[in-house]
Amino acid sequence: MATSSSLPRLRSRTVARDAGAPAAYALGALLLAGEAAVHVQQFVAEFYGVRWIGPLFVANAVAVVVTLAGLARARTRPAAALAGIVISAVALASLIISYGQGLFGWQEAGFRTPVALAMITEAGAVILLATALALRSE
């Protein structure tokens, strides 16, 4: 009795792909929320009085909240995912620049826990939201 092993394998790949995009969207949203939390905490603890940087931390958190609202609706999810990628990539690039020449007069020194958390949440959000968009278009 011969059986074809390609049918179950094909079915499992399809199921994995169909489940992959929603999971990537959800995890990307979770990382975006973490990014906003880090920015709010750092604004309150350290950057409330720093010209330009403090307001940019608040702007990041507000943009993330709007993006999370967009990710909650299926119709706006792809655009919101793209916005989340841009927000996180810009935040990560800004952090990197602040370690070099500085950003708007602020130069980051040392490697603190909030910096590590920001890097993890921002890079993770970019990767997962891009993955969600890629899986969606297949």
What is the meaning of each model-derived region?
Residues A2-E138:
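Membrane-interface extramembranous regions
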